[in-house]
């Protein structure tokens, strides 16, 4: 159970930063070289590396080294897993819906 929460935290962390959300938006149109991401985002190399590590560790993004640059793209399996984890967290079972009565003895 603990490892599932660790996975969720790792995946959800990928979505908790404006720069990472911008990177994900850029990658929706296809693979991008790190040089293009640097140009689009107007951030430094070390900042981009930090964000790409978090995105790759989450499984949502994958990198492919070509020469001195890394090319990044969305990982279909990783994005499907992120969607599954989010749906799992937000889903209420029918029992949970029925149990949602007044809180703390209130009416």
Model-derived segments and spans:
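Alpha-helical residues within the helix-turn-helix
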Residues: 39, 56-57
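Amphipathic alpha-helical dimerization/coiled-coil segments
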Residues: 2-7, 76-107
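Mid-chain, well-packed structural core segment of small domains
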Residues: 57-58, 66
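N-terminal helix-turn-helix DNA-binding core of bacterial DNA-binding proteins
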Residues: 6-47, 66-79
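Residues within the DNA-recognition helix of helix-turn-helix
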Residues: 51
């Amino acid at each position: 159970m603990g490892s599932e929460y660790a996975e969720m935290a790792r995946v959800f962390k990928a979505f908790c930063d404006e720069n990472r959300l911008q990177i994900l938006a850029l990658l929706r149109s296809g693979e991008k070289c790190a040089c293009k991401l640097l140009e689009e985002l107007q951030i430094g190399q070390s900042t981009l590396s930090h964000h790409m590590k978090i995105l790759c560790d989450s499984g949502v993004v994958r990198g492919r080294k070509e020469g001195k640059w890394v090319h990044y793209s969305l990982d279909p399996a990783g994005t499907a897993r992120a969607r599954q984890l989010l749906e799992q967290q937000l889903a209420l079972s029918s029992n949970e819906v029925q149990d949602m009565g007044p809180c703390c003895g209130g009416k």
